[in-house]
Amino acid sequence: MRCGYCMPREVFGSDFHFLPRAELLSFEEISRFVRVAARLGVSKVRLTGGEPLLRKDVPRLVHMLRAIDGVQDIALTTNGLLLAHHAAALGHAGLDRVTVSLDTLDEDLFRSIADTRAPLARVMDGIAAAHEAGLDPVKVNMVVRRGVNDGSVLEMAEHFRGRPEILRLIEFMDVGESNGWRLEEVVPAREMLASIAERWPLRPLSPQPDQGVASRWAYEDGAGEIGVI
């Protein structure tokens, strides 16, 4: 997989020199950093990437972080392709919850956006495995781009309505020169919400202290909630 947002093939090609493995932080170094941060009041930790599940033995790192005084919540963000294999071990190690990046339910579009030959079913299996492992709530992040996958918003909303997952719609953001950000591809949050509310009425939910940057909306018919970032 070569995610077009953070690792497009045209920028990170075969001649790109990645950081040598010997220079990566060890689990012990990561744990030491988190231990210091926890003493300063940090209580929530998120493992992300790149793809964190490409790192060998990530459940061991989760177990080490779980043992640190002051750490109350450990989350992980993943593309979901390896999640089915690791979910049970991650849950057993003490992971609290997981966020899966998924931008469409269309097989061909999924492979195009993710630049992968892996089937969409592997991501869906990973989401199911996360539930079985008790990694709830499972949040599904969808980055929406006009002319790319904005036509998938209603399909995604319909699929995840009434399910335990929380769909979060994300405006296409400029993260530097690598992701080819263009203003004309940005779909404003209000536009995404309006398209969904036209079919399924929504009501705003009161902010929670730990909800982060997302605004939360509930379906008026009780079929769950969505978030917008």
Regions found by a protein language model. Name each.
Residues 7-10, 102-104, 171:
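Short, small-residue-rich loop/turn micro-motifs
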Residues 1-25:
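Canonical Radical SAM [4Fe-4S] cluster-binding loop centered on the CxxxCxxC motif
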Residues 13-18, 106-114, 176-180:
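A short acidic, helix-capping loop that chelates divalent metal ions and anchors anionic groups
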Residues 8-11, 95, 114-118, 197, ...:
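A generic structural signal for secondary-structure junctions
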